[in-house]
Amino acid sequence: MRPDYTLTDRDFINPDTIDLYGNTNAHLLTAPPAAFVLEFPGLGGGSCLGGCMDVGPYNGPLSGFLAERGILQVYTFPGPWSWMNRGAVRMIHALVDAIREKYGFTRETPWAVMGGSMGGMGALIYTANGDPAYTPTACLAHCPCVDVLDRVYCKENIPRTFFRAVADYEMPIAEALKTISPICRVEDMPHIPYHIINDLADELFPPEQMDAYVEALRGKGHTVTYHRLPNCRHGELTGEEWEVIRTFLLGHLVK
């Protein structure tokens, strides 16, 4: 530690420590990447899109596909109960800075955020951060929770995670939860392309809440591709939808 004990975010998250804050597909790249994707974890640290918080190379369902096309993929570690709270946003900002520095990316370099369940909600809430320096090129959310206040008690072990996510906010708990609830942040969403996936047999988050959220986004003039998957339970995807995900990412990341 420095003699004066001063530390900055970069002392923790920098080009040399990226692998401690996210698993990447860098080992699969055959040339310097031209774009990047950040994937956010679901509750507990895993992901219905393939990620795992065990530190190591990322070999998820999209890792090789993206690497072959010059796209760095990073499965981030903002915390298994974070729900993209302000601490998670700060960590992701620092990680974006480190990635840009390591790979020589500029603010014009295309990048996307994505995730499923808590990670899908995280992708939406992170996109609403309000700082143009950290506004992604595109956002993909699979089966996200979009109405936190309504779904706090959707499962016995869920309330503690929401409480922990915003426990240090100096405001009433209901107001704090609104800051991480997508339906309450529609006004803050930037005008970028969105792809949102709704599992119609979802046992945690009612499909009609997603319908209302997408309608609200479109009502504000946002470009949203919206797929409703019949018979899919929470976190499930069809083979056809995986292909749609690949097409969406390539369409916005490859020039």
Regions inferred by a protein language model and the residue ranges of each:
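Alpha/beta-hydrolase fold nucleophile elbow
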Residues: 105-117
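C-terminal catalytic histidine-bearing segment of alpha/beta-hydrolase fold enzymes
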Residues: 40-43, 85, 204, 208-255
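The feature captures the conserved acid-bearing segment of alpha/beta-hydrolase catalytic domains
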Residues: 150-156, 163-211, 215
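Short, surface-exposed "cap/lid" segments of acyl-processing enzymes
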Residues: 27-65
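N-terminal cap/lid segment of alpha/beta-hydrolase-fold proteins
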Residues: 1-32
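Conserved alpha/beta-hydrolase
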Residues: 61-83
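Hydrolase active-site cap/lid region
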Residues: 124-171
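Alpha/beta-hydrolase active-site loop
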Residues: 82-105
